[in-house]
From Swiss-Prot:
Its cofactor is [4Fe-4S] cluster. Residues 5-236 form the Radical SAM core domain. InterPro entries: Aldolase_TIM (IPR013785), CofG_family (IPR019939), Elp3/MiaA/NifB-like_rSAM (IPR006638), F420 (IPR034405), rSAM (IPR007197). GO terms for molecular function: 4 iron, 4 sulfur cluster binding; 7,8-didemethyl-8-hydroxy-5-deazariboflavin synthase activity; iron ion binding; transferase activity, transferring alkyl or aryl (other than methyl) groups. The keyword Metal-binding applies. Pathway: Cofactor biosynthesis; coenzyme F0 biosynthesis. It is an enzyme of class 4 (lyase). Belongs to the radical SAM superfamily. CofG family. The gene is cofG. This is 7,8-didemethyl-8-hydroxy-5-deazariboflavin synthase. It comes from Trichodesmium erythraeum (strain IMS101). Catalyzes the radical-mediated synthesis of 7,8-didemethyl-8-hydroxy-5-deazariboflavin from 5-amino-5-(4-hydroxybenzyl)-6-(D-ribitylimino)-5,6-dihydrouracil. Its EC number is 4.3.1.32. Binds 1 [4Fe-4S] cluster. The cluster is coordinated with 3 cysteines and an exchangeable S-adenosyl-L-methionine. Pfam families: Radical_SAM.
Length: 319
């Protein structure tokens, strides 16, 4: 069994925090019109400060502007230009900005090496609880997004959010839905298994997901999902070293994007790199960098992106 655990050295840029969804567990969003938008000049300052400091991936993460909003086009154009900017500075963009149209996904494929969208849970009962004010959390819309990503040959990351009112059966149903779509298109790189962790801004009163159960969920995911999908866990949300290690023993092999700040979970800082290595090495695990696109998908990329990815692979010997 391989004892290699991967992560992506990443930095997150946020076009806007405003979001027309209002998930009761969210620690990220602000109300529409209440959040300023990131300017390209400010984004350039942020990205230039990262040059030659080890960052590979630029994750564009945004609140959602309603599809019918008069600001939707400007929102999308900003996201596109931010990805272009990241590419121009030699970084590799990955975008996760919520529900997109098929044509929007097709456009963003030209400036992203991979994309993502959390499926969270496909049970419709959450639309009466934590997602009752979240129109884009309707399960069939998110499943459609995964289908389109496959049709468009976009390397994709999705995942489950645990502890938001679902059951063990719901976990399995969501994992099986991901498996079925992947077996059709073969495009899903990673599935994130994310425990809900309460923060200072959420409205929902909850103790969060019991992380002691996380190794069990990993084992279930490892059984349900095809072996060519990598299971990812966020180390900043798994504070107990023994739980993190148990998750690895049960099949998790990736720790996601690790950078200065977790925008989605701002109350949970990423672990210090050396401390993480110490925990992993105590059980014979080796932490290694990866790119935000797996090598088996390089040929899916537009030629200009493929060339940039190839330069990174040669530079870091990541194949």
């Amino acid at each position: 069994m391989s004892r290699i655990v991967t992560y992506s050295p990443a930095y997150t840029i946020v076009p806007t925090y405003e979001c027309f969804n209002n998930c009761s567990y969210c620690n990220f969003r602000s109300d529409p019109g209440k959040s300023s938008w990131l300017s390209l000049s400010e984004a350039e300052k942020q990205l230039l400060s990262l040059k030659n400091k080890g960052t590979i991936e630029i994750l564009t993460l945004s609140g959602e502007v309603h599809p019918n909003s008069k600001y939707r086009k400007a929102w999308f154009q900003l996201i596109y230009k931010l990805c272009q900017l990241a590419l121009s500075l030699g970084f590799l963009p990955h975008t996760n900005v919520g529900i997109l149209t098929r044509s929007e996904m097709e456009e963003l494929k030209q400036v992203n090496v991979s994309m993502g969208l959390m499926l969270e849970q496909i049970t419709p009962k959450l639309l009466k609880i934590v997602h009752k004010n979240s129109p884009s959390k309707i399960p069939h819309l998110r499943l459609q997004q995964l289908e389109w990503a496959g049709e468009l040959r976009i390397p994709f990351t999705t995942g489950l959010l645990l502890g938001i009112g679902e059951t063990v059966t719901d976990w399995k149903d969501t994992l099986e839905a991901i498996s079925n779509i992947h077996q059709k298109w073969g495009h899903i790189q990673e599935v994130i298994i994310q425990p809900y962790s309460p923060g200072s801004e959420n409205k929902w009163v909850s103790d969060g997901f019991n992380v002691n159960l996380l190794p069990e969920v990993i084992a279930i995911a490892n059984e349900v999902l095809p072996s060519n999908i990598t299971l990812q866990i966020p180390p900043n949300l798994v504070k107990k070293p023994e739980i993190l290690l148990a998750c690895l023993e049960n099949g998790a092999r990736d720790l996601g994007g690790i950078g200065p700040f977790d925008e989605i979970n701002p109350d949970y800082p990423h672990p210090h790199y050396q401390a993480l290595i110490k925990v992993l090495e105590s059980r014979g695990w080796q932490l290694t960098k990866r790119l935000p696109v797996y090598s088996k998908y390089d040929d899916w990329l537009p030629i200009n992106l493929k060339n940039i990815v190839s330069e990174w692979r040669i530079k870091l010997s990541i194949y």
